[in-house]
Regions:
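N-terminal cap/lid segment of alpha/beta-hydrolase-fold proteins
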Residues: 12-52, 285-294
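Gly/Ser-rich "nucleophile elbow"/oxyanion-hole loop immediately N-terminal to the catalytic nucleophile
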Residues: 47-48, 115-135, 151
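Short beta-strand element of the alpha/beta-hydrolase
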Residues: 50-61
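Short glycine-enriched nucleophile-adjacent loop
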Residues: 138-149
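Accessory cap/linker subdomain of secreted extracellular hydrolases
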Residues: 161-308
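Short beta-strand/loop motif that positions the catalytic acidic residue
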Residues: 318-321, 325
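Conserved alpha/beta-hydrolase "acid-adjacent" motif
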Residues: 326-332
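Histidine-bearing beta->alpha loop at or near hydrolase active sites
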Residues: 348-363, 375
Length: 384
């Protein structure tokens, strides 16, 4: 089993094409240490069609053993380096690390705008710029497209929390507190007071989680009836295996991301004191005993200000999402559809559902098909 730190991490990384060059992007702030400089990858084919694709990468844990690196792994599907396919069609491609890992949407927007300016200054002015993002990076891509329609001609969000980070925080927080109710012996701390060093015990937690869930199938079924987190229900065997996989993925974020999330927003952005949880049986005991968390209003405002999509599209956006996504639930797509409709901008949104269980479980053909749809719509765009 592979935990998804960022999407598309399941294949070996091939050598970079000769058209691609890696380099640091210098910053003007002398307080920024050299190892935290933004790393950039720029690929320009000989037959450049004057269109540029920028990629916003997915979640990388904020712990120091995860350095600021280029997202080469997540750009490889079916042993194919996706930018190489774009280069063959004449597109230039660029991506970068950010100045921090973890909860980075606000930082990522600034860094990718800097990347665009750097490309324009060092390579030339493209005629069209397209933004693509995977998982957490898809949220960044949408916000860039919404906020800077004068700079981006179209966008593609893959398996992304398109409905906004507040909904994603609610999903992750609810799963954690309900998990703790059914399996109280795994964690000795609450959902949002995760110790900074808790990640060092992750391997121990994994062993405990697997044992608890496989030895108490009834409690596992209850957990998923309450949280509605995605599993593959095709058989009892696949239910158990995917239930464990989903739990490990979501609890990974709880342990590895929560301290940085709280620090970045200046408090707890999650509230469940008045939430009613409903499952198969014994809902009264569940609601009496489940951990109740009080949010910090400033942290909630921060999440809404910097991590919430608005739906105010002025350029075409295509989304690609697994129907049974265990990490970023598909209902994000329904939320965003409502936001876009509320802005009367539905003509700019194309959502493509992909059957099956998994996070960012796409084939090369599916990603290229969605990319082609985005290009076709953007090139045919004639203005509001």
């Amino acid at each position: 089993m592979m935990l998804v730190l960022s999407p598309f991490t399941r294949a070996e990384v091939p050598p970079l094409p000769p058209e691609c060059k890696q380099q640091p992007l210098a910053v003007n702030d002398p307080k920024t240490p050299e190892e935290d400089f933004q790393l950039v990858l720029i690929c320009v084919p000989e037959n450049w069609n004057r269109s540029l694709v920028i990629y916003a990468h997915g979640f990388v844990p904020p712990q120091p053993q995860f350095p600021l690196v280029l997202p080469i792994n997540e750009l490889t599907i079916d042993n194919t380096f996706l930018p190489q396919l774009l280069l063959a069609q004449g597109f230039a491609f660029t991506t970068s690390s950010y100045h921090k890992n973890g909860a980075v949407t606000q930082q990522a927007i600034d860094d990718l705008l800097d990347l665009l300016n750097f490309f324009q200054g060092s390579v030339g002015l493209p005629s069209h710029v397209f933004i693509i993002g995977g998982s957490e990076g898809g949220l960044t891509a949408i916000q860039l497209l919404e906020q800077h329609p004068d700079q981006f001609a179209g966008g593609l969000a893959l398996c992304a929390p398109v409905g906004g980070a507040p909904h994603q925080i609610k999903y992750l927080g609810d799963f954690r507190v309900v998990f703790d109710y059914f399996f109280p012996d795994v964690f000795s701390f609450g959902a949002f007071n995760v110790p900074l060093e808790a990640f060092k015990q992750w391997d121990t937690y994994v062993t405990q989680i697997i044992a608890e869930m496989t030895n108490h199938v009834g409690a596992t079924a209850q957990l998923f009836s309450v949280t509605r987190a995605a599993v593959d229900p095709s058989s009892l065997t696949t239910f158990i295996s995917t239930a464990v996989e989903t739990a490990l993925d979501l609890l990974f974020y709880s342990i590895w991301e929560t301290p940085d999330l709280v620090a970045t927003g200046g408090g707890i952005p999650y509230e469940n004191r008045f939430r009613l949880y409903v499952g198969l049986t014994n809902n009264l005991a569940l609601n009496r005993q489940v951990e109740r968390v009080k949010s910090d209003p400033e942290a909630e405002r921060y999440a809404r200000m910097f991590y919430q999509t608005k739906g105010n599209l002025e350029r075409p956006l295509v989304t690609l999402h697994n129907l049974l996504d265990p990490i970023v639930p598909f209902d994000h797509e329904l939320i965003y559809r409502g936001l876009v409709a509320g802005q009367q901008k539905s003509r700019f949104l194309t959502a493509i559902p992909v059957p099956g269980y998994g996070h960012c479980e796409f084939t090369t053909a599916q990603v290229l098909g969605a990319f082609g749809t985005m290009i076709q719509q953007a090139m045919g765009f004639t203005g509001p």
